[in-house]
Regions:
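Short, charged, amphipathic alpha-helical segments
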Residues: 3-11, 31-41, 58-68
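Short, solvent-exposed, charged loop/turn and helix-capping segments
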Residues: 19-34, 50-61
Length: 85
């Protein structure tokens, strides 16, 4: 996966997480937020696959590890599948 593609996926993930935050802050509806979290995690799977396949700078991999860990905490909270290693 090229850097441009990875950046597009990162932008999609950022937008998805913004929707999660906005929905939760506005409505506090666990069902709707669970759905939005699930969508965000689906997007994050694309990034994760690229990170696992590609030879990326160690700092990029370290940052993704941190983000992925936080996403998985969110997945646990909303009882949706985690981003797999």
């Amino acid at each position: 996966m090229r850097e441009e593609e990875l950046n597009r996926h990162a932008d999609r993930l950022e937008r998805a997480m913004n929707r999660v935050r906005e929905s939760w802050n506005r409505e506090r509806n666990p069902g709707k937020t669970r759905y939005l979290v699930s969508e965000a995690l689906t997007t994050s799977q694309e990034i994760n696959r690229a990170m696992m396949r590609g030879r990326l700078h160690p700092e990029v991999q370290k940052q993704w590890f941190i983000v992925r860990s936080e996403l998985n905490r969110l997945a646990e909270a909303f009882e949706v599948p985690k981003v797999r290693w």
